[in-house]
Swiss-Prot record:
Pfam families: Sulfatase. It is an enzyme of class 2 (transferase). This is Phosphoethanolamine transferase CptA. The chain crosses the membrane at residues 17-37, 45-65, 69-89, 119-139, 154-174. The keyword Membrane applies. The keyword Methyltransferase does not apply.
Length: 577
């Protein structure tokens, strides 16, 4: 009798486990594998989708005899969520994220209807059918995964502990992070897996929305600038501010770099007298949010919190009677980018062109060209347009189309001693600069084609060290170990003939002035003809009263952390520092 019972006891099957894994992985990992194989992002999403899809094995291990029912119920939820995410990727080439939720909730009913109607195409129907058939076929292959007691409980707990409980315990009790930050970190890891991209996306969206609304309400409560006057006349005009990303001028041929990385801007500079190139502008912070909190407000290194207590550039232009626009190819609703969204919401109309889940994904700045043309055609008599680019942000090869790697494999004008990976990054950065040149030049040309009355100013938020400074082993930005290339930025001004005729200025004597972009609001006010209490013409690079001052860099919130940029040692004399 005992022998018979032993023979009929169900045995563990690796094959059954394999089919169960394939089934649950299918709903998340297929999309992440496509994203990775097509070169649109790295391996993090693929890794996390594999890990967190494995959580669905727990009920399968605990109740092996009901695997078909459990898998069917869970599968319907996973199928619906993953099909929506897959369809979104097929249409837009982007992952679903909290930024998508933000854009969807910000649209009106008609826009939302148009947005959703794009799903009902023949292509999407065929994708949905194939996807559904594959899911059903995998479901039919499922068999019970028998794990003897007590191992089934131990294995199930190990999965739960390793993926959920351990990260929470480590962050909360060992690293002493708040529960909010702990859950936010866990949510970002779970996001690539269905249906967590919707659950965590909504959680993160609500979290950032609360912070966003608090900052916007505080901004709305600020008093307007006192004794405000616009001396530029009443003629219709369009003023444009283009903000780049991670672009150091030392790698631009426009500034003397031997590789031809900016051919279109080079040509414009030679042929168009309206383009002025300023040669000695630096940023105060090597990070996007931190510098824009200064460049777009009255804050600076000595008064870093004034962005919270004084009006911004966007507030100022609305006070001057401009209809204001914000066009961005940066991510929208992320913990890091909430302040950017706050700035954007201070304008009348926003265009959010990048809803990627991660910044390290293929997204091209050509996205901004169509909405820019549309805004130029807006009938408002006074328009102020901000265009925020991804520029040359790391990962550099994701900033330009794959077939436009002009400098791939090149070794000319390369620092000595670079490894093959470092050489690839060095060349990728030059390729990204080349594409950035096309985008910035296109914006200038599209603006010029409207025969505008106004000006366009372009600068990059900060620079980037890409093995430029000896010993040529540093890539990126580190405020605690600064190099000149992290802070040197392009600063270009294109003035239309109409604006120049009405407001004649000669900038030829200004181009070599030492300047910090943290003072940008004073230069912008000067160019736009705006005065008010707090405007300081000595802090405008284009004003005859300009006075050079110490260009502070560093973290203003750390004691004794500010240093004079001009005391930094020079690297190799390549390009402009």
């Amino acid at each position: 009798m005992q022998s018979t019972l032993l023979q009929t006891k169900p045995a563990f099957s690796w094959k059954a486990l394999g089919w169960a894994l394939l089934y649950f992985w299918f709903f998340s990992t297929l999309l992440q594998a496509i994203i990775y194989l097509t070169g649109y992002s790295g391996t993090n999403g693929l890794r996390d989708s594999l890990l967190y899809s494995s959580l669905w094995l727990i009920p399968v291990f605990l109740f092996p005899g009901r695997i078909r029912v459990i898998a069917a119920v869970i599968g319907v939820v996973l199928w619906a969520a993953s099909l929506a995410a897959l369809s979104y990727y097929v249409i837009y080439g982007q992952e679903f994220s909290q930024s998508v939720l933000f854009v969807m909730f910000e649209t009106n009913a008609n826009e939302a209807s148009e947005y959703l109607s794009q799903y009902f195409s023949l292509k999407i129907v065929l994708v949905a059918l194939a996807y559904t058939v594959a899911a059903i076929l995998l479901w039919t292959r499922l068999r019970p995964v028998y794990i003897p007691s007590p191992w089934r409980y131990l294995v199930s707990f190990a999965l739960l502990y390793g993926l959920i409980l351990h990260p929470i315990a480590m962050n909360t009790f060992i690293k002493h992070k708040s529960m909010e930050k702990t859950l936010d970190s866990l949510a970002s890891r779970m996001e690539p897996a269905a249906p967590w991209q919707f659950i965590t996306g909504y959680y993160q969206y609500r979290l950032q929305l609360a912070s966003l609304n608090k900052l916007l309400n505080e901004n709305d409560a600020l008093p307007p600038l006192a004794n405000f006057q616009d001396h530029s006349g009443d003629a219709p005009r369009t003023l444009v501010l283009v903000i780049g990303e991670s672009t150091q001028r030392g790698r631009m041929s426009l500034y003397g770099y031997p590789r031809e990385t900016t051919p279109e801007l080079d040509a414009l500079h030679k042929t168009d007298p309206g383009l002025t190139v300023f040669n000695n502008v630096v940023t105060s912070r090597p990070y996007t949010i931190e510098i824009l909190q200064q460049a777009l407000t009255f804050a600076d290194e000595k008064n870093p919190d004034w962005y919270l207590t004084k009006p911004s550039l966007m507030n100022m232009m609305k006070q001057a009677g401009y209809k204001t626009f914000w066009i961005t190819n940066q991510q929208t609703m992320t913990a890091r980018n909430t302040m950017l969204t706050v700035f954007s919401k201070q304008t009348d109309k926003q265009f959010y062109m990048n809803q990627q889940r991660t910044q390290s994904a293929r997204e091209y700045d050509s996205n901004v060209l169509a909405p820019f043309k549309a805004v130029l055609a807006d009938p408002a008599p006074k328009k102020f347009i901000i265009v925020h680019l991804l520029g040359t942000h790391i990962k550099y090869k994701f900033r330009y189309p794959e077939n436009q790697g002009k400098f791939d494999g090149k070794t000319d004008h390369v620092p000595p001693g670079l490894s093959s990976d470092e050489l690839e990054s060095y060349n990728d950065y030059d390729n990204a600069n080349l594409y950035n040149d096309y985008v910035v030049a296109s914006l200038i040309k599209d603006y010029k084609a409207t025969d505008p009355n106004g000006f366009l100013l372009y600068f990059s938020d900060h620079g980037e060290e890409v093995y430029d400074t000896p010993p040529h082993k540093t890539q990126g930005r580190n405020e605690d170990s600064p190099t000149r290339h992290m802070y040197t930025v392009p600063f270009l001004l294109w003035t239309s003939e109409k604006w120049q005729a009405a407001h004649p200025r000669d900038f030829s004597q200004d181009v070599d002035r030492k300047y910090s972009s943290s003072e940008l609001i004073h230069t912008w006010s000067d160019l736009a003809g705006l005065t008010y209490d707090g405007y300081d013409p000595t802090r405008s690079i284009t004003n005859p009263q300009f006075k050079e001052t110490t260009r502070w860099i560093g973290n203003p919130y750390k004691k004794n952390a500010l240093i004079d940029y001009d005391t930094l040692p020079y690297g190799d004399q390549v390009g402009n520092q």
